[in-house]
Regions:
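Short secondary-structure junctions
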Residues: 15-26
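Intrinsically disordered, low-complexity regulatory regions enriched in serine/threonine/proline
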Residues: 1-9, 28-146
Length: 146
């Protein structure tokens, strides 16, 4: 599997979890938040980095809609990525059988991406993630959530 095939596989799996494709990324939204998945191709090797960005509706008196600029921006109000345990799934410089890569990507979605984004689609969920130490909130974002 090469990186292009991987992106197609990522797209198929993301869609099974109700992520919509737009502007080279994927998103899921609620009335309170917008969750974005962005695969960023490295300039230093044959690998991707997964950026998970959450934008909170109403923060700084703004409404956030999926756009190329928003999907490709480096930072959301809340940011995450793939966990250390799954970093190798995105690295094509390290050999891995296609079937194993596919299964591990599915596992990453079920164990991390889906639970994290589902929780982060609400202000209360974001507060819970911060209380558990799963995310860090800048003081300005924390104040906006109060």
């Amino acid at each position: 599997m090469d990186s292009k095939d991987f992106k197609t596989l990522f797209d198929e799996i993301a869609k099974t979890y109700d992520f919509k494709k737009a502007f080279g990324g994927w998103y899921k939204d609620s009335s309170e938040c917008l969750a974005i998945l962005d695969l960023q191709k490295s300039n230093f090797g044959d690998y991707y980095q997964l950026n998970i960005k959450i934008f909170i509706q109403g923060v700084f008196e703004k409404t956030y809609l999926p756009s190329k600029d928003l999907i490709k921006k480096s930072m959301g109000h809340v940011n995450s990525g793939e966990t250390k345990d799954y970093k190798d799934v995105f690295d094509f410089d390290k050999p891995m059988k296609d079937e194993i890569r596919k299964e591990r990507l599915k596992e990453l979605f079920t164990k991390h991406i889906v639970p994290f984004t589902n929780e982060a689609l609400s202000r209360a969920g974001i507060r819970r993630l911060a209380e558990k130490g799963d995310i860090f909130l800048l003081s300005t974002i924390r104040e906006e959530l109060s």
